[in-house]
Amino acid sequence: GRIIDQNVLDKVDYPINFHDGPLPKYGGLYSSTWAILKNENTHGCCWHLMTSKIDSGDILSSKDFRIEDTDTAYTVDLKSLIYGFEMYETHILRMIRQNSIRVKKKNNKIISYFGKKDFSKIPNKGLLNFKKSLKYNYKLFRALSLSKEKTSLLFQPKISWKNKIMAVNNFNEISVDSIKFFEKNKNITYNNNSIFVRKNNKYYQLKLKKKKF
């Protein structure tokens, strides 16, 4: 997207925009990623009036929803889009047709905006590190598992294996019976385009994307 000049916005009766995050708490880019990294239990989305300042217009309609423990940034984004379409059909269109725009009062107690300058705050540049806890690694995987269109190296969960950086596509616990090739005293190994990890007496499979960096 891009910033639209105010003189252009003034030519439109109701310039509106959809934002896939709750405003003003999660303005800017990749709101679902930051919400997961910050251990949020809920997220949201909204339609708002547009101004020359990004994500700062009055709220027309909003929806909050739960972030499940298994949700990734991608599935949170999907929920936002589904609720966004529902709000457009049930609220936004009706207000436009009736020429009766009502705004909702914003909660300005927490205002934050995440831009490109914040990308450096992604833990370990998105590299999983199994010297750290399983909870840490799974959260990082979930937060960086976005849609296929977002292919930036930074915004993908990754793992380093024998001096190669590889993007992780899936992260699942598996049965110990399915592991036949683990060497003794080793907690991580590679087999058939997957990294296998032994952690806290459990086994996990990290399926890799074919693209290597």
What are these regions (language model features)?
Residues N108-F213:
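Internal anion-binding site segments
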